[in-house]
């Protein structure tokens, strides 16, 4: 690889605040040319993009990325470790799953990934300033959203296809009426409250 930027991986996670489902991380390595192309297509923080735009960009990222990988931590791991440690575990799994080892990981936020045998730098709001992190945020968001839509078929009644596992009014109401599923995070207060008798 003759382009130094091809050795830089962006890492981000989604689903930290959700009540349902795993936390998902992605890592993406992009060449300078790929960054230029994706930025010209409007790539930015996934939260600022419509679902349709995220899907288009996700397909473009997968086409032009030097490498990418998704990692996740299960609801069981979230409840056992806590959401921060589970998020970092998902990030670590994503990076270690890359086909080649990057020279540097740019990690969104202010927490370093523990036990990562790769140099890393944390970047607060990195999904807004680092193209590699923005790409990772899009990949992770689309992947997790698609998973939650599939799980909505298995666990009807919680409006998961709409809320993507986050604590909307409908979701909280369903928790009170139906109780939690195996994919709800019992370490989160709204899920715990649904287990208490009225």
Swiss-Prot record:
Keywords: Cytoplasm, Endonuclease, Hydrolase, Manganese, Metal-binding, Nuclease. Transmembrane segments: none annotated. It comes from the Bacteria. Endonuclease that specifically degrades the RNA of RNA-DNA hybrids. HAMAP family: RNase_HII_B. Belongs to the RNase HII family. This is Ribonuclease HII. It comes from Acaryochloris marina (strain MBIC 11017).
């Amino acid at each position: 690889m003759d382009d130094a930027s091809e050795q830089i991986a962006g890492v981000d996670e989604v689903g930290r605040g959700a009540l349902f489902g795993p936390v998902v991380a992605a890592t993406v390595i992009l060449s300078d040319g790929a960054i230029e192309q994706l930025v010209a297509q409007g790539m930015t923080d996934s939260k600022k993009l419509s679902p349709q735009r995220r899907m288009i960009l996700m397909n473009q990222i997968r086409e032009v990325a030097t490498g990418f990988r998704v990692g996740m931590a299960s609801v069981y791991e979230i409840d056992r470790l806590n959401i921060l440690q589970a998020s970092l575990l998902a990030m670590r799994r994503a990076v270690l799953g890359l086909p080649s080892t990057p020279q540097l990981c740019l990690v969104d936020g202010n927490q370093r990934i523990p036990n990562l045998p790769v140099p890393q730098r944390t970047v607060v709001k990195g999904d807004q300033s680092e193209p590699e992190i923005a790409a990772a945020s899009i990949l992770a968001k689309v992947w997790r959203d698609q998973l939650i839509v599939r799980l909505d078929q298995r666990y009807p009644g919680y409006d998961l296809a709409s809320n993507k596992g986050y604590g909307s009014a409908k979701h909280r109401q369903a928790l009170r009426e139906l109780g939690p599923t195996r994919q709800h995070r019992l370490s989160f207060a709204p899920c715990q409250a649904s287990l208490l008798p009225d």
